[in-house]
Amino acid sequence: MTRKKLFITGASGFLGWHLCGAAQLDWDVYGAVNRNRINIPGITVLPIDLTDRSSLKDLMQDLQPDAVIHAAALSRPNDCQSNPDASFAVNVRASLNLAEYCGALEIPCVFTSTDQVFDGLNPPYNESAPVSPINLYGEHKVLAEKGMGERNSNAIVCRMPLMFGVAPYAESFLQSFANTLQAGQPLKLFTDEIRTPVSGQTAAQGILLALKQGPSCLHLGGPERISRYDFGKVLVKVLNGSEVLLQACQQADVPMAAPRPSDVSLDSSLAFKLGYRPGSVEAELQRVFGL
């Protein structure tokens, strides 16, 4: 029996790499990357500039995928704030073009959005909460969510929380946290930034669940609302380190290009009902480190 084709953008990125691994069980996976010399076992790697409209159109027509997961993004809020044109080209224009081509093929397109579409003033946020971004990254993700839905009735928005884990071609914040602690250096962490984090492995499973179940919007946060500082305390526990190295601070103490919402905890009750099963932060960290 011929397996269906799944096209994943951002395959060399943190989330995309986890998606490629998880999707191979049920799909023939084709992964878009923005550079050559990348090997992801078990998938067909397709180098492409997603901002090149004609190249993307040709690829979609040649590949004829059965579904698409759009995980490629400029995802660092400070970088987006400092480079608005680049952010718009990748996070908005490329997303809308991809949704248009998926609409023409009448196939589902899962879009990985973010908890940064909210202002942090009324958590926790469920799927029906009004969007209210306070930084450019969030604004561009809102534009992409809306525009993709207009271009493809089969578009599925997955709003992602803070994610952590290990991937060969991209890092999450976890590596820098762990490296700092293991080097015996102090680690400053915000007490006033609250998220609902999950591992990259868990996030990938949630996105594939969304593709299978087909809701128009799904939040994929974890079960715990936790600050970065308290996350650090759990990390220290898992790594058998010392909390002495942790230094509490607030967002106002660190100059940043992009404003940050204080509490963008996601209410992921709908995903839980559909079978999404993220573990506690401690359990997820133990899984990441193979403990």
Residue ranges and their predicted role:
Residues 82-110:
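NAD(P)-cofactor binding segment of oxidoreductase domains
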Residues 42-52:
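Rossmann-fold cofactor-recognition segment
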Residues 146-195, 201-202:
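NAD(P)-dependent short-chain dehydrogenase/reductase
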Residues 89, 93-97, 117-158, 164:
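Catalytic helix-loop patch of NAD(P)-dependent Rossmann-fold dehydrogenases
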Residues 4-26:
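N-terminal Rossmann NAD(P)H-binding glycine-rich loop of SDR-like oxidoreductase domains
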Residues 50-90:
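NAD(P)H-binding glycine-rich loop region in Rossmannoid oxidoreductase-like domains
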Residues 259-291:
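C-terminal amphipathic/interface module of NAD(P)-dependent oxidoreductases
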Residues 206-207, 212-257, 289:
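Mid/C-terminal beta-alpha module of Rossmann-like enzyme folds, strongest
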